[in-house]
Amino acid sequence: MSDAIAGPEQTPNRNFGFALDVDGVLSKKTPLPHAIETLQLLHSQGIPYCILTNSGGVKDEDRAMAFTKQFHVPISPEMVVQSHTPFLEVAGQYKGKCILALGGISSKVREVARSYGFDHVVTGSDILTAVPNIWPFAEATEAYHKANAQPLPMGPDGHPMPISAIFVFATPRDWGFDLQLIHDLLVSHGGRLGTRSAFNGNTALPNNGFQQDGQPSLFFCNPDIEWATPYCEPRFAQGAFKAALEGIWASDKPQGTRMLNVYQCGKPTTESYKCAERRLSLLQKRDGRGEPLQRVYMIGDNPASDI
């Protein structure tokens, strides 16, 4: 294989590319046998590829740097599709508006959201610090939230800006509080905390009046119910958090009331595969690799989440 690894200037026309999973395909904590050589071969032969993973919680740039170091081959941010990377493509819809970003640790979720172009980003820590009595069970987490809080962005009326969308970037660490926040906003008037829409429960309106009053849209990025950790059994992941929210939503609403305006990306959703395909096509065009892509091969190890 080493004889085939030349410089990246050897770029014959290719009309195919690869989307590669990481865990179980390229590495298991450390690179699997021949993973590094395979990526080097793709690079030297001018074959476009991207890393498609349900990991998240850090900026695409930081993930790309980590992959570059791990696999000893240059991987740019454009070659990385994390679970939340498709959020980048909807950021323009919220220009000048305020979003709630949930999940992950410390302030990393805020950094990720801002790297995608969201102008005004609020986290659960910001809200709990500004309105301590919004969550009565903060004894174990209050210090953590205060350490990671920033002031709430204010609107021209002197009040906190309304929340126009909720983005779950990674599995939340404070489930109870985050579930409360999301539910509060989904039944609010226009995405303003501390309000409740007068339309809720009106059976003469669509969806029994719920989410008919300017409430925020809701975005999830990883449908996995469980994931592998050092513990001997799988642990709950973001998909389980979404299921918990759906259970709460259904528990006290009139029969047939749906949770509307919910967007889901992350493997194996169509949105994530389309995002990967668009990125590969841009890489193909940017690097002058000849004809447009005709095929993209997905390499994974779990049909339930990779296909």
Question: Could you say what each language-model-derived stretch is?
Answer:
Residues M1-I307:
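HAD-like aspartate-dependent phosphatase fold
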